């Protein structure tokens, strides 16, 4: 089974995760074509940095103007449906998983306001996050990734609304090993993608045969360990009885495997 492992070291955004997949070999021109086919602006920024100590790829979708004052759960569902309707209707349900986790975390962080009415801008969510999610799925599709795993990591308690939301979202990420990562550095939407899309949070071991390693960074000039996410592409094999307690679905398609 072709799999992707994600390892977070510090700062984490959706764009960093996309940048890592470009570093993995997904052509930017392919991503632009997917945006165009979905009726979305093609004005993203991407830049490799092969001379840095950590060779990583920078990617960013700049914010656009003239946005509504509030951004609520219903808006995410509506916009996402429009994005997926043209070329990838099968991805609509995948987005729902992310949004459900996101709004639940936002509700916990923002005065327990119900998830369906909380303003998601208060925790840093924007419409551009949906475009980045679409490109992340498109990149996985290009690489023929069948399932996604995240390496466990420990986190600190959040202080701001965004940090508290990230902490509330990352219920499966908790590990007692290693230096805790500040939730203030983890974008809630990126946290929701890890939590909503990962088949499991588990360490890489002998069952995973890595083929390629790539990095995405939030810095175009100085990628470091703290502002870089690592992504490992390879093959996951397991002959054990059960890894997960549920029948796994791979990006909206039944994998046919009880793991």
Spans of model-derived segments:
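Glycine-rich nucleotide/cofactor/substrate-binding loop typically near the N-terminus or early
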Residues: 23-111, 172, 181-184, 191, ...
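Flexible, glycine/proline-enriched loop segments at strand-loop-helix junctions
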Residues: 84-92, 118-128, 153, 157, ...
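Mobile "lid/hinge" segments at catalytic clefts and subdomain interfaces of large enzymes
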Residues: 28-30, 139-257
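Conserved phosphate/anionic-ligand binding catalytic regions in large, soluble enzymes, centered on
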Residues: 6-19, 118-144, 255-257
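N-terminal glycine-rich phosphate/adenylate-binding segment common to multiple enzyme folds
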Residues: 103-106, 114-117, 124
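Acidic, glycine-rich active-site loops and adjacent beta-strand->loop/helix elements
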Residues: 9-10, 38-39, 127-129, 152-159, ...
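Short coil/turn segments at secondary-structure boundaries
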Residues: 114-118, 207-210
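Extreme N-terminal starter segment of soluble prokaryotic enzymes
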Residues: 1-5
């Amino acid at each position: 089974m072709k799999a992707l492992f994600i390892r977070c070291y510090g700062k984490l955004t959706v764009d960093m995760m996309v940048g890592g997949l470009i570093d993995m070999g997904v052509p930017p021109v392919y991503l632009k074509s997917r945006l165009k086919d979905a009726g979305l602006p093609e004005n993203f920024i991407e830049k490799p940095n092969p001379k840095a100590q950590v060779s990583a790829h920078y990617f960013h979708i700049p914010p656009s103007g003239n946005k509504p004052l509030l951004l609520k759960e219903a808006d995410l569902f509506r916009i996402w449906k429009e994005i997926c309707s043209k070329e990838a209707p099968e991805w609509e349900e995948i987005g729902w998983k992310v949004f459900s986790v996101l709004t639940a975390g936002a509700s916990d962080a923002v005065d327990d306001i119900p998830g369906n009415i909380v303003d998601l801008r208060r925790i840093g969510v924007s419409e551009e996050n949906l475009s980045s999610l679409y490109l992340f799925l498109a990149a996985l599709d290009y690489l023929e990734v069948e399932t996604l795993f995240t390496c466990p990591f420990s986190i600190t308690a959040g202080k701001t609304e965004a940090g508290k939301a990230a902490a509330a979202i990352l219920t499966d990420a908790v590990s007692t090993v290693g230096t805790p990562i500040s939730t203030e550095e983890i974008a809630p939407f990126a946290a929701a993608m890890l939590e909503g899309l990962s088949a499991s949070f588990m360490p890489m071991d002998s069952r995973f045969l890595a083929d390629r390693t790539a990095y995405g960074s939030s810095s175009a000039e100085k990628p470091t360990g703290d502002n870089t996410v690592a992504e490992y592409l390879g093959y996951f094999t397991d002959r054990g009885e059960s890894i997960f307690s549920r029948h796994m679905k791979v990006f909206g398609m039944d994998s046919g495997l009880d793991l």
